[in-house]
């Protein structure tokens, strides 16, 4: 498991998607590094405010997963998140899509039912959402038409593959080629080819995979050892599944790129075929001129065969000779 650093967390948050797998994988990583709860929540809060509107709700889903699943290990995250949640809920309710209101209310109801936080604090969070509904600046209203939910974005991406290809400028070919090569090179180190991790997973003890073997545990010390092993196995598998999910998306993107690249090459091929035909015609015309020129040259008289018109003849008289009286 990779060590904690703020830059590593920022990178993981930038890659966070709305899928349950992505949220749970990052949640497990954060819980594993719970001794850094303070910096983690600080970075989470900062990145939440910087995130695009259609990703903000996912940040709260992540916080929910971390808060609820870390309670049995300690109160660190529950306490640290409490200090920023009022601002976070207010910010998300104000900046995110209108459709976020119900998920936020549902999340607060769950926290109230499970006593994640006290009733007074839950009420404070609800009030922060209501306060955020005060008339925003005009710029916010103008942005609403541009906001899309994660599902809409996914549907639009799916619509783009493969039927709705839009023709590309053939001159974009070199750029597409570079992008395609990079995508293929990136997949050389894909999760599915990570033999080291696969070997670790294959080497996991049977106890972490078979519930029936739990009956053999008779003392607390053995149970705690197994609990630690299970946590590590869960973290290993969750992270690997997350990498596999990311690889799957990369391969989908590569498939879309291949469709685009193939169409681009077809466009280039069509253009080059026209150019080839054009230059074939030019070659034919130049060849015809060459042939006619050669024939014309052969029809001209050979001046070297003419007699020497100056040899053996007397020189012409000079002007003085013409007017001489002799």
Curated annotation (Swiss-Prot):
Which InterPro entries did the record assign?
CID_dom, ENTH_VHS, RPRD1A/B_C, RPRD1B_CID
Q: Which Gene3D superfamilies match?
A: 1.25.40.90, 6.10.250.2560
Pfam families per the record?
A: CID, CREPT
Q: Where in the cell is it found?
A: Nucleus
Which UniProt keywords are listed?
A: Acetylation, Nucleus, Phosphoprotein, Transcription, Transcription regulation
Recorded GO MF terms: identical protein binding; RNA polymerase II C-terminal domain binding; RNA polymerase II complex binding
Q: Does the keyword Membrane apply?
A: no
Q: Which residues form a coiled coil?
A: none
Tissues/organs with expression: Preferentially expressed in a range of tumor tissues including colon, lung, liver, breast, prostate, stomach, uterine endometrium and cervical cancers with higher levels in tumors than in adjacent non-tumor tissue (at protein level).
Q: Which residues carry this modification: Phosphoserine?
A: 132, 134, 166, 299
Main subcellular localisation: nucleus
GO CC, one annotated term: transcription preinitiation complex
Q: Which residues form the CID domain?
A: 2-133
Q: Which intervals of the chain are annotated as region Disordered? A: 127-149
In this UniProt entry, the residues modified to N-acetylserine are 2
GO process annotations (BP): mRNA 3'-end processing; positive regulation of cell population proliferation; positive regulation of transcription by RNA polymerase II; regulation of cell cycle process; RNA polymerase II promoter clearance
**Which residues get modified to Phosphotyrosine?**
161
Biased composition range(s): Basic and acidic residues? 128-144
Q: What does this protein do?
A: Interacts with phosphorylated C-terminal heptapeptide repeat domain (CTD) of the largest RNA polymerase II subunit POLR2A, and participates in dephosphorylation of the CTD by RPAP2. Transcriptional regulator which enhances expression of CCND1. Promotes binding of RNA polymerase II to the CCDN1 promoter and to the termination region before the poly-A site but decreases its binding after the poly-A site. Prevents RNA polymerase II from reading through the 3' end termination site and may allow it to be recruited back to the promoter through promotion of the formation of a chromatin loop.
Record note on quaternary structure: Homodimer. May form a heterodimer with RPRD1A. Associates with RPAP2. Associates with the RNA polymerase II complex.
* Similarity field: Belongs to the UPF0400 (RTT103) family.
Record-given protein name: Regulation of nuclear pre-mRNA domain-containing protein 1B
Q: Which organism is it from?
A: Homo sapiens (Human)
Cite the source lineage: Eukaryota, Metazoa, Chordata, Craniata, Vertebrata
